[in-house]
Amino acid sequence: MSLNAETKAAIVAEYAQCENDTGSPEVQVALLTASINHLQGHFANHKHDHHSRRGLLRMVSSRRKLLDYLKGKNSTRYQDLIKRLGLRR
């Protein structure tokens, strides 16, 4: 259910603040968003997969916390990120 290395590298390259940046909130949120979108496709066919649903809810919660952190630190970066990812908020 995880993303492959090429997809992760592409996401990191797109959202990184500088070279080799994998820890910034933008990169972490983008990776979590890609994983969440991947799992949502999984649930279209596997409606009763409750174990994976719990993992999905943990990812959503983690993404929410990172977005709240980023909003508190730098609201312009937060607004730019949710616009780029197409998230509601």
Swiss-Prot record:
Give the CDD domains listed for this entry. Ribosomal_S15p_S13e
**GO-annotated molecular function:** rRNA binding; structural constituent of ribosome
Alphabetic keyword roster: Ribonucleoprotein, Ribosomal protein, RNA-binding, rRNA-binding
- What SUPFAM superfamilies has UniProt attached to this entry? S15/NS1 RNA-binding domain
Q: Name one GO cellular component term.
A: cytosolic small ribosomal subunit
Which Gene Ontology BP terms does the record give?
translation
- Quote the subunit structure annotation: Part of the 30S ribosomal subunit. Forms a bridge to the 50S subunit in the 70S ribosome, contacting the 23S rRNA.
Q: What does this protein do?
A: One of the primary rRNA binding proteins, it binds directly to 16S rRNA where it helps nucleate assembly of the platform of the 30S subunit by binding and bridging several RNA helices of the 16S rRNA. Forms an intersubunit bridge (bridge B4) with the 23S rRNA of the 50S subunit in the ribosome.
Q: What protein family does this chain belong to?
A: Belongs to the universal ribosomal protein uS15 family.
Name under which the protein is recorded? Small ribosomal subunit protein uS15
Gene for this protein?
rpsO
